[in-house]
Swiss-Prot record:
Negative results: only weakly inhibits Kv2.1/KCNB1 (18% current inhibition at 300 nM). Has no activity on Kv2.2/KCNB2, Kv4.1/KCND1, Kv4.2/KCND2 and Kv4.3/KCND3. In addition, intracerebroventricular injection into mice does not induce observable neurotoxicity symptoms. It comes from Heteroscodra maculata. This is Kappa-theraphotoxin-Hm2a. The keyword ATP-binding does not apply. GO terms for molecular function: ion channel inhibitor activity; potassium channel regulator activity; toxin activity. Keywords: Amidation, Disulfide bond, Ion channel impairing toxin, Knottin, Neurotoxin, Potassium channel impairing toxin, Secreted, Toxin, Voltage-gated potassium channel impairing toxin. Expressed by the venom gland. SUPFAM superfamilies: omega toxin-like (SSF57059). Inhibitor of voltage-gated potassium channels. It specifically inhibits Kv2.1/KCNB1 channels. The lineage of its organism: Eukaryota, Metazoa, Ecdysozoa, Arthropoda, Chelicerata. InterPro entries: Huwentoxin-1 (IPR011696). It comes from the Eukaryota. Belongs to the neurotoxin 10 (Hwtx-1) family. 13 (Hntx-13) subfamily. GO terms for cellular component: extracellular region. Disulfide bonds join C2-C16, C9-C21, C15-C32.
Length: 38
């Protein structure tokens, strides 16, 4: 199971296709954001 857009992610919870796990200020944990691919 993968994490969708804006979902919390880490080493165990990976993002779905075309998403990348990043820290987005001001959020302190990492979330899945678009990696600009299609």
């Amino acid at each position: 199971e993968c994490r969708y857009f804006w979902g919390e992610c880490n080493d165990e919870m990976v993002c779905c296709e075309h998403l990348v796990c990043k820290e987005k200020w001001p959020i302190t944990y990492k979330i899945c954001v678009w990696d600009r691919t299609f």
